[in-house]
């Protein structure tokens, strides 16, 4: 499992620890990833995702998983999020076909 947010795409960065004597040693800056369960109203199911705290805030700010994914262009979404978006669109099309 990669250390990458499935919504924002944030990943590991590298840099230096710098001591008081200005000695530098390499280090990694890890994203604050949380295993979260988001509920999709359209799918009628919960979706487990590994998101950064910034990604969780972004989804909540946009009104939930469904509205965030449907309102975001595919070029801005990582592949994992695009897969969930396609599932949501398929279910929406089926529901629209049943009502028509």
UniProtKB/Swiss-Prot annotation:
Listed InterPro entries: Ribosomal_bL28, Ribosomal_bL28/bL31-like_sf, Ribosomal_bL28_bact-type, Ribosomal_bL28_sf
Keyword vocabulary terms for this entry: Ribonucleoprotein, Ribosomal protein
Matches recorded under Pfam families: Ribosomal_L28
A single Gene Ontology CC term: cytosolic large ribosomal subunit
Entry's Gene Ontology molecular function annotations: structural constituent of ribosome
Gene Ontology biological process: translation
HAMAP family per record: Ribosomal_bL28 (MF_00373)
Record family assignment: Belongs to the bacterial ribosomal protein bL28 family.
Protein name: Large ribosomal subunit protein bL28
UniProt organism field: Gluconobacter oxydans (strain 621H) (Gluconobacter suboxydans)
Gene name of this polypeptide: rpmB
């Amino acid at each position: 499992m990669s250390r990458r947010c499935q919504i924002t795409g944030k990943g590991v960065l590298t840099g230096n620890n710098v001591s008081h004597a200005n000695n530098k040693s390499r280090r990694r800056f890890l994203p604050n990833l949380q295993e979260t369960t988001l509920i999709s109203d359209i799918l009628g199911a919960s979706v487990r995702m590994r998101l950064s705290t910034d990604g969780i805030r972004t989804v909540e700010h946009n009104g939930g998983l469904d509205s965030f994914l449907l309102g975001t262009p595919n070029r801005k979404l990582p592949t994992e999020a695009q897969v969930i978006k396609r599932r949501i669109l398929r279910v929406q099309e089926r529901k629209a076909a049943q009502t028509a």
